[in-house]
Amino acid sequence: MTKTETINLRGPLKGEFEVPGDKSMTHRAIMLSSLAQGQSVITKPLLAEDCLRTMKIFELLGVNFDIKDDKVFVDSPGYQNFKTPHQSLYTGNSGTTTRIMAGLLSGIGIQSVLSGDESIGKRPMNRVIDPLKEMGASITGIENNYTPLVINPSDIQGIDYKMPVASAQVKSAILFASLFSKTASTITEIGITRNHTETMFEHYNIPLKINGNVIQTIPDAITSIKVKDFTVPGDISSAAFFIVAALITPGSDITIHNVGMNSTRSGIIDIVKEMKGNIEIINQTNTSEPTASIRIQYTPDLQPAELSGELITRAIDEIPIVALLCTQANGSSVIKDAEELKFKETNRIETTSDELGLLGFEVHPTDDGFIIHPSKFEHAASVSSYTDHRIGMTLAIASLLSDETLAIRNFDSVNTSFPEFLPLLKSISQKG
């Protein structure tokens, strides 16, 4: 990831469009469709680098994928007939692939090695390794904490696990491993995390018992899996960049269609409402993975906010772009309880404050978030995404607040989740 992108865009932003399919759900659709024996179709998946890494791993296990237009046709021999891979399973920059596949492969008992890029090699894996070992998995990492992860066949047992951190990836790794256990598992969450694994288990006929923050599996749950087609809603994390762009760019009026509105992911909507942003939710569906259209208009009098608790958990991936939004409020804002940002593709507390700070924005880091003061784009300094897709896209949106041209190093990092980001942004800025 070395490309430098020169960006010089003008508002207002106008138009109606969709964003690509949800990354979290695409990963899980690939995994569950591959576990089930037979043929299925995934419609509107995200075909970006992270999800393609997951797909490639299952190809090495014996699953066939055929991509045609906005569909992926899956033909799987089923988990019972997976092949032992004779090469390392490369996860690239995808923490979701690395952590959930660690649980899935441990559950199946396939001898394998999971390795990622340099960024993944710095992200903690003990939060997955430790509970999997408690379940009887034979899994090791460098210093018990880093990739590559070496997995050997073992007999997985159920676990009664109280989550030490609010992490959907850890929860999902345990749930996927528990599919293959002869005994039940019970997982107790300490806070709200995205529940796509649970809703999609239900879609693929895998039984779970959920009571508040307690999730219980049943023995041999994998035997219940059914071949199912799945349509992926638009990714609200990708939509967030355009939501903020319209709110802060004078004259803007956009509508984003078919956006996933899962309540565990829709924190960005509540944040915008708290800041009195001009946002309207229309055409909402009432399904296990609801969708809606979102209309956003420029809002010159955004209110400051104090953001913490479950609202942060429900918008954790959107915090960098929320930080930019807060710079345009008419008072100082505070973001707390966001320690998890330290364990993303970069330490996003540092990279968000550093890179926006270089442009003149007053985004001051704290141990668990930011203190943000009203501020302007002062000058086009040399900035970098540091190979973090969400930092790269946040900086691109920041450029709308300046007449200067902005050069962003390592901008090709956006390809991990949103290859069409810049062309789409350019297309709606040209409609002004």
Swiss-Prot record:
Its EC number is 2.5.1.19. One of its GO terms (molecular function) is 3-phosphoshikimate 1-carboxyvinyltransferase activity. It is an enzyme of class 2 (transferase). The active site is at D317. PROSITE patterns: EPSP_SYNTHASE_1 (PS00104), EPSP_SYNTHASE_2 (PS00885). CDD domains: EPSP_synthase. It comes from the Bacteria. It is found in: Cytoplasm. 3-phosphoshikimate binds at K23, S24, R28, S167, Q169, D317, K344. The keyword Cytoplasm applies. GO terms for cellular component: cytoplasm. Signal peptide: none annotated. Its main location: cytoplasm. Phosphoenolpyruvate binds at K23, G95, R123, Q169, R348, R390. It catalyses: 3-phosphoshikimate + phosphoenolpyruvate = 5-O-(1-carboxyvinyl)-3-phosphoshikimate + phosphate. The keyword Transferase applies. Gene3D superfamilies: Enolpyruvate transferase domain. Pathway: Metabolic intermediate biosynthesis; chorismate biosynthesis; chorismate from D-erythrose 4-phosphate and phosphoenolpyruvate: step 6/7. Keywords: Amino-acid biosynthesis, Aromatic amino acid biosynthesis, Cytoplasm, Transferase. Transmembrane segments: none annotated. InterPro entries: Enolpyruvate_Tfrase_dom, Enolpyruvate_Tfrase_sf, EPSP_synthase, EPSP_synthase_CS, RNA3'P_cycl/enolpyr_Trfase_a/b. Catalyzes the transfer of the enolpyruvyl moiety of phosphoenolpyruvate (PEP) to the 5-hydroxyl of shikimate-3-phosphate (S3P) to produce enolpyruvyl shikimate-3-phosphate and inorganic phosphate. Monomer. Belongs to the EPSP synthase family. PANTHER family: AROM/DEHYDROQUINATE SYNTHASE, PENTAFUNCTIONAL AROM POLYPEPTIDE. This is 3-phosphoshikimate 1-carboxyvinyltransferase.
